[in-house]
Amino acid sequence: MSRPSSVSPRQPAPGGGGGGGPSPCGPGGGGRAKGLKDIRIDEEVKIAVNIALERFRYGDQREMEFPSSLTSTERAFIHRLSQSLGLVSKSKGKGANRYLTVKKKDGSETAHAMMTCNLTHNTKHAVRSLIQRFPVTNKERTELLPKTERGNVFAVEAENREMSKTSGRLNNGIPQIPVKRGESEFDSFRQSLPVFEKQEEIVKIIKENKVVLIVGETGSGKTTQIPQFLLDDCFKNGIPCRIFCTQPRRLAAIAVAERVAAERRERIGQTIGYQIRLESRVSPKTLLTFCTNGVLLRTLMAGDSTLSTVTHVIVDEVHERDRFSDFLLTKLRDLLQKHPTLKLILSSAALDVNLFIRYFGSCPVIYIQGRPFEVKEMFLEDILRTTGYTNKEMLKYKKEKQQEEKQQTTLTEWYSAQENSFKPESQRQRTVLNVTDEYDLLDDGGDAVFSQLTEKDVNCLEPWLIKEMDACLSDIWLHKDIDAFAQVFHLILTENVSVDYRHSETSATALMVAAGRGFASQVEQLISMGANVHSKASNGWMALDWAKHFGQTEIVDLLESYSATLEFGNLDESSLVQTNGSDLSAEDRELLKAYHHSFDDEKVDLDLIMHLLYNICHSCDAGAVLIFLPGYDEIVGLRDRILFDDKRFADSTHRYQVFMLHSNMQTSDQKKVLKNPPAGVRKIILSTNIAETSITVNDVVFVIDSGKVKEKSFDALNFVTMLKMVWISKASAIQRKGRAGRCRPGICFRLFSRLRFQNMLEFQTPELLRMPLQELCLHTKLLAPVNCPIADFLMKAPEPPPALIVRNAVQMLKTIDAMDTWEDLTELGYHLADLPVEPHLGKMVLCAVVLKCLDPILTIACTLAYRDPFVLPTQASQKRAAMLCRKRFTAGAFSDHMALLRAFQAWQKARSDGWERAFCEKNFLSQATMEIIIGMRTQLLGQLRASGFVRARGGGDIRDVNTNSENWAVVKAALVAGMYPNLVHVDRENLVLTGPKEKKVRFHPASVLSQPQYKKIPPANGQAAAIKALPTDWLIYDEMTRAHRIANIRCCSAVTPVTILVFCGPARLASNALQEPSSFRVDGIPNDSSDSEMEDKTTANLAALKLDEWLHFTLEPEAASLLLQLRQKWHSLFLRRMRAPSKPWSQVDEATIRAIIAVLSTEEQSAGLQQPSGIGQRPRPMSSEELPLASSWRSNNSRKSSADTEFSDECTTAERVLMKSPSPALHPPQKYKDRGILHPKRGTEDRSDQSSLKSTDSSSYPSPCASPSPPSSGKGSKSPSPRPNMPVRYFIMKSSNLRNLEISQQKGIWSTTPSNERKLNRAFWESSIVYLVFSVQGSGHFQGFSRMSSEIGREKSQDWGSAGLGGVFKVEWIRKESLPFQFAHHLLNPWNDNKKVQISRDGQELEPLVGEQLLQLWERLPLGEKNTTD
């Protein structure tokens, strides 16, 4: 066969492709092979290689070999494709014998930096004390060794099935003969339904067959009537029956049950009932139960006998193909053999009939026609033509069309121009500063950057600016003048030029030019500044296409890894119109081109919808309008426009009723939707695809279909789940159209072209093929026969998922201890199957219950389960502002998880104050996402209560499981336990992040850890700088996306090595996990053996602790032994809690948790990580913690009052990071060392985590957030002592126990409740002396008094036995003797309603004269009791 041997670059199609051959299919392949430079090889070779590699990826082999007959070009193609698929390829041999092998990554090819863990003295002490009091018992030890043989499966199975029966199951009832139906007002309506004519035929066919398919158009009445036909027939013939009818959604199950009960004139809960998770209305009389697919599945998990008393199962809406319905059918097909009397009815609106006929073996199909009313359809081009819709961008496009052709010509010249062959249009003046250092975000009070309205539109730019920008871009391109970037950045910042500025003669942006020239660090800087990676030049090329065309492979990787994570579906319309638009009329084609040019297909055009809605409301007859939108975000956005923002509607809201339909919505709203509106009022319904089939609104005449749906998809090889917006299927589009013709002829407006409609998929991809399967594998274990492997059971599904994906999921469940080696569920596994979140998040939540920090973890887990609440603005300057908001929420904690938590808490506060809309806009948050997270939290907490993890009162109640919620180190431990194995290690020497299988991992630009510098212009070596700034060597992350050689992580948190050592790896460690120094030296250091003699000597005295294939720690023997024992204590405690969630805690349990908390807190502190305040607050009307963020930037010289400082975001996050840590960090962030920011210590009385910060221009920063002290005047100055001319203040301090007072007297410290901190701090700064008088509750005495000698810090003490205390402050004890209350009987406090001084609550202030008299009483104590402390 002929082979073109040249490797000439071909011009990729507009919109970017390259690649030639088909891109590898399958979940992992998607568009990922697009990075292949267009290597010219035969099409059939490409296809063959693609298929071979795809089989290899999903198969069992570790390695495959390609024949030596390949040419070098073909080998190049294979190398490149392998790389893009995450495989390792190598060529060996010479000349004609040169052959190529491809291997899967197993982690062995990554060399790792040594993993160490140095414990502080306090940590060792805490663990030693625990182990001395409660040594690890033999029982605990043996229970934590790997199992060597399988247990008695049947016994365990029975016991655990019993245990996990708590909730969400259908009751066992017995079949009975139904009662006679009552007559109702709906009878005539029922008889008018199309399904009614077929009543006898349907009943007869169901009697004669085990399985029946019923396909009826939407609104034909099949959902409500078929179950009633069965009931009526059984009543007539005196036959007992019991029917389950499943719905894909909770809302539908309730709505249909209520409607059917009403049609039979019964109350719900009699013959007709419903059951959804955590809510049911059923009684012993109930014969027809509507439930969700999930509830029926959970019922079947209790054993096959649960269906022995059921006569009919109806699975409705089968076409939705959600994973539960596919999964249910798999199980039901098995059960039909076991229960000969059981009948299965599948009903659906649009069904892939042949698939199901094949699946159930030639079962009969009944077709029911819909209603006859005609529905006119209008596609996008018709809408644009008839309504004359245009927007600013469309007008601009029409104007610029001629210019575009000119630009394309200039671009072509640019591409062919060799370097320096052009004279630059103008010699630029070199006026460039070293911009990067100049612009620190802190110089101008932060927000100011973004307040200068957003970037100027190119039309508003002055001619000199346009000329200057053009000259810079031309120089960069034509002369590879990398220095010109400094000027570009300078103009973007100082002149507000958009980062997406287009060269006026070629339309190229800075990002395209940098990508084409291969300037990697500038590409990174531009992306960090918010440059749009999807922006296209006049020839349709994006930056990615520039990089491909000019062979810049590193940049191709970079851009692909970035856009792979942007959650973009594949929605681009304009390329479709260009390639296939030949059968459109010229006018339509132009209209569509102009429209697509003006609007981003990754969104929903709410402007166009408002335009249409206005037209309908003003020119059409009455009738409800149903608008299909992809998700809750768009629903809320459109609702706000109609009710508040659009004058055309907002001024006459009495003429409209707006309803929202979404599966997470309250059921009450849904009932209102079904009612007819008053005369003269138009109903407008905003809905997701739930209104496609599940809920029928009769009076809809107009449908507006956005044509999009949000779909969760999962890349099984990368373990990444994304919520993507995708085009709906043809079947869905037809369904949606059918919603309009229910009561009279209607119109369906489709916001997509005819061409798009023709290119849509026929049916939606089954969820089973695009969802993470861990959750499903857990359920499979409970459904499948005892000895049936999970993969075998799932292979029986109507469309089974690939075996490799199932295997990966099972492997992951074993890794997180949900399953053992034999695929049997562990105690943890049974509980995880019960929780409505993915298993790793379930584990995180259960660990939080045991660590008693549930609340923050509930919020974080639900956010991770749903989606990131931060929205990505389109404008670059806004992207930077959004990033800063995210940063501000992290409060310097090196944690994206913190940003999620605090954003949610701040939103709740704003919500309780009634300004959540403005709050969300200001902070780039999605109101809709927050509302859904609240719903998920409630459901998850409900499930924990149902399973006994959270009790109603007493030990284990909601307060108890939140004892440690304020301690961020403990919260992070629960995160680590849930996120394992998603860990990354910092290689300090090479400044890279490494993972178990990745040599090089990068921060995703959306992570707050990616830019610790807070520069407006990110530094050129951004990643290295970010890694350098990390305070610890370990990170956890939520997801990693790979594109070629680059792995990106997002949603990360920095954690201490001790957290990894205790909470990562399997609970059951092999007995040789700990290797003492002698044996360790013989084996050499795993993966780390070094050539240098010196290193061997230093490591020879160290022990090794091996947690899994990758986590091999090298540490001193004592530390290794202590940590191993602490691990064992934790894991055996966790196991006990899983076995008996509601059992009271023992002394050992409490001591173990206390020790763990002490260790985590000490190590966190020694790493220099901040302990932010307020993270443990429960969702409730919130405290001053979240004052409106507007006050975040204060004038530098105003002295902060304590009222201002409570909000810990008062100062910029950067300052927080710059604050000195309480004790030296393990790796002091290099950047601060270099810049000499760490100043000498302040006065001895002062807490050490303040430093007076001087900025480069010597204007001082606001004081660090952690302390409300005024900024100190000069470097190293003493902390100002309280002023002598100020008043003296007196406060009563109540203590719950005497031990705390003893500690206070020994150590000279005290802590009070957060509510008292504010007033004490204020008193400390506003008075000369603050006296504290102590009294132990119930003792009848005052136990002495002290003077407050420092303000209250953020640091907490682990010494106090009481929960809920705030930061530590210093006190000087003056008297320590007890003064009986009777000595003070005569003293009344006018500041407390003249009550006696001893009747004071904690923190009660005394009127100064009374305070002074009280202290003088100590002088009168009898001599024997005096014991002054001088």
UniProtKB/Swiss-Prot annotation:
Superkingdom to which the source organism belongs: Eukaryota
Motif DEAH box positions after renumbering to this chain: 316-319
Sites of Phosphoserine modification: 1089-1090, 1092, 1202, 1263, 1267, 1281
Ranges of compositional bias, category Basic and acidic residues: 1231-1249
Entry's localization field: Cytoplasm; Cytoplasm, Perinuclear region
SMART domains per the UniProt record, alphabetical: DEXDc, HA2, HELICc, R3H
Keywords: ANK repeat, ATP-binding, Cytoplasm, Differentiation, Helicase, Hydrolase, Meiosis, Nucleotide-binding, Oogenesis, Phosphoprotein, Repeat, RNA-binding, Spermatogenesis
One record GO biological process: germline cell cycle switching, mitotic to meiotic cell cycle
Annotated effect of mutating residue 317 to A: Abolished 3'-5' RNA helicase activity
Gene3D superfamilies per UniProt: 1.20.120.1080, Ankyrin repeat-containing domain, P-loop containing nucleotide triphosphate hydrolases, ph1033 like domains, R3H-like domain
Catalytic activity, as annotated: ATP + H2O = ADP + phosphate + H(+)
Binding site residues for RNA: 1294-1296, 1310, 1360
Coiled-coil residue windows: none
Domain Helicase ATP-binding: 203-369
One Pfam family linked to the record: DEAD
Binding-site list for ATP: 216-223
Physiological role: 3'-5' RNA helicase that plays a key role in the male and female germline by promoting transition from mitotic to meiotic divisions in stem cells. Specifically recognizes and binds N6-methyladenosine (m6A)-containing RNAs, a modification present at internal sites of mRNAs and some non-coding RNAs that plays a role in the efficiency of RNA processing and stability. Essential for ensuring a successful progression of the meiotic program in the germline by regulating the level of m6A-containing RNAs.
Protein name in the entry: 3'-5' RNA helicase YTHDC2
Species of the source: Homo sapiens
